[in-house]
Swiss-Prot record:
GO MF term set: ATP binding; ATP hydrolysis activity; ATPase-coupled transmembrane transporter activity
Lineage, highest ranks first: Bacteria, Bacillati, Mycoplasmatota, Mycoplasmoidales, Mycoplasmoidaceae
Described purpose of this protein according to its UniProt entry: Part of a high-affinity transport system.
Record family assignment: Belongs to the ABC transporter superfamily.
Pfam families, A to Z: ABC_tran
SMART domains per UniProt: AAA
GO-annotated cellular components: ATP-binding cassette (ABC) transporter complex
Name this polypeptide is given: Probable ABC transporter ATP-binding protein p29
The keyword Ribosomal protein is assigned to this record: no
Residue ranges of domain ABC transporter in the record: 7-245
The organism's place on the tree of life at top rank: Bacteria
SUPFAM superfamilies listed in its UniProt record: P-loop containing nucleoside triphosphate hydrolases
UniProt keyword terms in alphabetical order: ATP-binding, Nucleotide-binding, Transport
Organism, scientific name: Mycoplasma genitalium (strain ATCC 33530 / DSM 19775 / NCTC 10195 / G37)
Residues given in the record as ATP binding sites: G39, K40, S41, G42, V43, G44, K45, S46
Amino acid sequence: MENKPILSFEKVSIIYKKAPLLQNISFKVMAKENVCLLGKSGVGKSSLLNSVTNTKIVKSGLVYFDGVASNKKEYKKLKKQCSYLDQIPNLIDTDYVYEAILRSAKQKLTWLQKLICFEPKWIKDKILAILKEVNLNDYVSCIIKDLSAGQKQRVEIAKLFFKSPKLLLVDEPTTGLDPLTASKIMDLITDFVKREKITLVFVTHDIDLALKYSTRIIALKNHALVLDRLTEKLTKEQLYKIYDN
């Protein structure tokens, strides 16, 4: 079966605070690709990623998800098959780790099960298995606010395991993390998308992470797309040029 694009940008322009941020951006992401959006901080990488689920920031052009344009009514429903992992974990500080993941797990329950607060055994078993996979099995009863930044990001990744999206958008997931923890976080993400056959688009300014974890790199500079190439055909020296003034 022919591999079709799951995500497309067609002449997309984004304005931030009344000033042009990105202009005339066009590219396609094929199913099961690991695509990295690379560039300096403030170049518009995160805004472009955010435009997939928040189309209000798109001033001109169209975003397509699974072949449906962002100006169609079906797009709003379809984009629910897309998950977004932010650089700042979206967690409740007073939750226990188990509770935080249970909130995502409850999306799989019927309205009646939610109403009577029914928690099937399979959900509990899966949560415990997931916590073991992300190396948080010793933190089940820990409060979120007591976790390190890396551990909080692991909780966010664990929440994704219940969603099984078609497309995973990841915005600077290693911000503020040491290199070893950053690699472990990226290992978890890429192992997950490979196992579940999910398409990944992630944002970073880290050239080493881009080269290690992507199959394709798209670089942004001076409001434009300046590079789109398979990762295996790129060198670190070529990517450093993107950061030149």
